[in-house]
């Protein structure tokens, strides 16, 4: 049914797992560059995302539509050493 994501408490102190990161980031060659992350995340976007669009599927696939002048660090580096694929 209608879940609503209220993130009033997680804005100031975001947990380490939800810190912003991006594996697929593309920037324009303009100055300053305009960078967008095309990562698909399940059920939510990263903590710094202002414009998050999710599909209505289960689980929801979410993409952040923000345009920044930088890319966040890659998410893959946060996994443990046993996760090498």
Swiss-Prot record:
GO terms for molecular function: serine-type endopeptidase inhibitor activity. Residues 1-20 are annotated as: Disordered. Residues 8-18 have a biased composition (Low complexity). SUPFAM superfamilies: Bowman-Birk inhibitor, BBI (SSF57247). Gene3D superfamilies: Cysteine Protease (Bromelain) Inhibitor, subunit H (2.10.69.10). Signal peptide: none annotated. The record marks 29-30 as: Reactive bond for trypsin. The record marks 56-57 as: Reactive bond for chymotrypsin. Keywords: Disulfide bond, Protease inhibitor, Serine protease inhibitor. Belongs to the Bowman-Birk serine protease inhibitor family. This is Bowman-Birk type proteinase inhibitor PVI-3(2). It comes from Phaseolus vulgaris (Kidney bean). The lineage of its organism: Eukaryota, Viridiplantae, Streptophyta, Embryophyta, Tracheophyta.
């Amino acid at each position: 049914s209608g879940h609503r994501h209220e993130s009033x408490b997680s804005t100031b102190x975001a947990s380490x797992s939800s810190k912003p990161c991006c594996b697929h980031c593309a920037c324009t060659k303009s100055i300053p560059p305009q960078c967008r992350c095309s990562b698909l995340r399940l059920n939510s976007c990263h903590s710094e995302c202002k414009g998050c669009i999710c599909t209505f599927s289960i689980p929801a696939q979410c993409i952040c539509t923000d345009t920044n002048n930088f890319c966040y660090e890659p998410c893959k580096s946060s996994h443990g050493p046993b996760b090498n694929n």
